[in-house]
Amino acid sequence: MRIVFLFFIFFSFSIQSQTLDYVFKSGEDGYKCFRIPTILKSQNGTLLAFAEGRKNSCSDTGDIDLVLKKSLDNGNTWSALNVIWDDGNNTCGNPSPVLDKKSGRISLLSTWNKGEDKEWQIIDQKVLILGEFF
């Protein structure tokens, strides 16, 4: 019983001492919401946080940009939001950064489709332009 009591005291203290900070927060920087976040640590230690910036809704279709924030202090603070790909009302999504450890080069793989294309149309290949990968 004593061990359980001490566990709860420690657990309660641990929860209370943590602060919660978001890299991307819905409703900020002109975006309704952010989805598909991913973080990569460069060879010089810079953290790069990528996400989809969804302008008008949290839907998987529509005006979606790729956005980036950087941290030089291991995530304690973050830069202002940078838009790295905005193709008007089209969907630029699924950011997937890859680090080449030999060269230090970072490649960002992503997808693109027309903003009015619905998910079921893309899956059934019923769109004029099939999604592109970059």
Feature annotation, model-predicted:
Residues 3-13:
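Sec-dependent N-terminal signal peptides
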Residues 16-134:
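Asp-box/BNR beta-propeller blade signature and adjacent active/binding-site loops
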